[in-house]
């Protein structure tokens, strides 16, 4: 009887607690990269929060969504990719250059899709502005300028979240933790995927911090890192 009880308890631990056990190791595994990302969020939270508040978005959820990107952010790599985007993307579009840029690692194609979807949504009228979505260098140059500042990326992040709530009304009925898991997956994988596809993608380990992925590269569930960040920030004061 005792042995059966122990086996049952161990089974429950593995089934229900595995995500907690493994997520608790993220801070140790990422080391200084985690600490630096955490410090960056803490130092900029006061500047970012008014932007998220403007769009009615929970800053804690927004910051958790992009936290994995802050962990693997590289100054020198971003400088090279940003320069390429500014030169090649502006003149030739996302088919010519579509590198992720900025602290939140946003691609021009992502911004294009957000611009277009925003313009077609009821939110554009509610907030009183639209984006220039013409297929020309002026529109692309303006888009790159928005992506080139942390404030601009915060606005794109907030708009992404509002559009996701609009597209998936039942998302708001989930717990905050579940919302983070869903939104982080959509942000990292494909924000235009269906509800079922995004739920399925939550299980995929595709996130890594290596410059180039090899067979030795360790991969993680992007959304679980976001959830860990959210829970840590929710349970402690900033």
Q: Where on the chain are the PLM-derived regions?
A:
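Bacterial N-terminal signal peptides that target proteins for export
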Residues: 1-9
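Sec/Tat signal peptide C-region and signal peptidase I cleavage site
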Residues: 19-23
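Catalytic glycan-binding domains that act on GlcNAc-containing polysaccharides
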Residues: 24-238
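Bacterial N-terminal signal peptides
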Residues: 9-17
């Amino acid at each position: 009887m005792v042995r059966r009880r122990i086996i049952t308890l161990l089974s429950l631990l593995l089934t229900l607690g595995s995500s907690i056990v493994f997520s608790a190791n993220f801070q140790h595994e990422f080391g200084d990269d985690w600490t630096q990302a955490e410090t960056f969020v803490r130092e900029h939270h006061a500047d970012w929060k008014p932007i998220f508040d403007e769009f009615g978005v929970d800053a804690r959820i927004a910051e958790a969504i992009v936290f994995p990107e802050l962990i693997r952010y590289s100054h020198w790599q971003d400088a090279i990719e940003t320069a390429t985007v500014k030169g090649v993307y502006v003149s030739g579009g996302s088919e010519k250059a579509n590198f992720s840029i900025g602290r939140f690692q946003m691609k021009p194609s992502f911004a294009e899709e957000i611009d277009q979807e925003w313009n077609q949504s009821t939110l554009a009228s509610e907030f009183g502005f639209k984006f220039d979505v013409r297929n020309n260098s002026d529109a692309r140059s303006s888009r790159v300028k928005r992506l080139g500042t942390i404030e601009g990326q915060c606005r794109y992040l907030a708009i992404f979240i509002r559009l996701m709530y609009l597209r998936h009304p039942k998302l708001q009925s989930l717990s905050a933790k579940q919302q983070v898991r869903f939104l982080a997956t959509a942000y990292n994988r494909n924000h235009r995927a269906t509800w079922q596809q995004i739920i399925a993608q939550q299980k995929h380990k595709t996130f890594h911090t290596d410059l180039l992925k090899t067979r030795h590269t360790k991969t993680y569930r992007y959304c679980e890192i976001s959830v860990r960040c959210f829970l840590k920030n929710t349970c402690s004061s900033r």
